[in-house]
Amino acid sequence: MSKKRIIFVLLYCDGFFCLSRNFKLQRIGDFRWLQRNYNFNYSATFIDELIILDISRKSRDINKFATLLYNLSENIFVPITAGGGIRSFEDAKVLFENGADKVCLNTSLIQCPHVSEKISSVYGQQSLVASIDFKHDHGDFKFFIDNGLIEVQYNIQELISFLDPLPFCEILLQSVDRDGTGTGFDLTLANTFRDQLSKPIILLGGAGHSDHLVEGLLHQSTDAVATAHLLNFVGDGLKLSREQAQRHSEVSLARWPLLSSTSFSTTKH
């Protein structure tokens, strides 16, 4: 039985971490706030991976984002995927050089597929995650890029045909409708994408508590579940969720030894 994963997502916007609901943002605090109020690297011992997305609505500063990524990666010992605003190979290179193990592409995946090909040629296909944002639409689906602002003019089969030849290792399926609602994952597309693309599926959008994470892990077509709900899961939330999932014999999670709690470093060493 292959190991499934629990992933936490940090949403970064214009210098602050945020909560998101249907892609509308609520500012929570900056890096120092996260350090002061949550022992995040303790919480990170109960996840399998971390995703950090720059969802800034104004102009993005890739170097500032890379510095944040570097500081986080100093004391977190799980693989890190970084994404948001990657428009070129050079953008991705900066993130890899500052702690990213993988990069996540959304807008450039659709608008500039040559970027994914260049990244893959240097860092390998296993370094790329395809991010797909979707909404329900009268029994069908709509797909979006650029923080949900631009609709992709593909139906589901056209999108799958477009993605099929691209070099990426897994798919992050994010429900805009469920984002931040705490009502559970939208599982409707997992089977279709998994069956037709034969890529691991990460679900994001809707997890409000540990039962939702377990439900997603139990789904036959999902390989990982992710949550960006900072207030619900940081602290003991991720620990309790992992323990609950491990009580299900159908869910195979890696068992990590508990790492000692250390404080964040806010500067490079």
UniProtKB/Swiss-Prot annotation:
It catalyses: 5-[(5-phospho-1-deoxy-D-ribulos-1-ylimino)methylamino]-1-(5-phospho-beta-D-ribosyl)imidazole-4-carboxamide + L-glutamine = D-erythro-1-(imidazol-4-yl)glycerol 3-phosphate + 5-amino-1-(5-phospho-beta-D-ribosyl)imidazole-4-carboxamide + L-glutamate + H(+). Heterodimer of HisH and HisF. Its main location: cytoplasm. The keyword Isomerase does not apply. InterPro entries: Aldolase_TIM, His_biosynth, HisF, IGPS_HisA/HisF, RibuloseP-bd_barrel. This is Putative imidazole glycerol phosphate synthase subunit hisF2. One of its GO terms (molecular function) is imidazoleglycerol-phosphate synthase activity. Its EC number is 4.3.2.10. One of its GO terms (biological process) is L-histidine biosynthetic process. The active site is at residue 133. Pathway: Amino-acid biosynthesis; L-histidine biosynthesis; L-histidine from 5-phospho-alpha-D-ribose 1-diphosphate: step 5/9. One of its GO terms (cellular component) is cytoplasm. CDD domains: HisF. It is found in: Cytoplasm. Keywords: Amino-acid biosynthesis, Cytoplasm, Histidine biosynthesis, Lyase. Belongs to the HisA/HisF family.
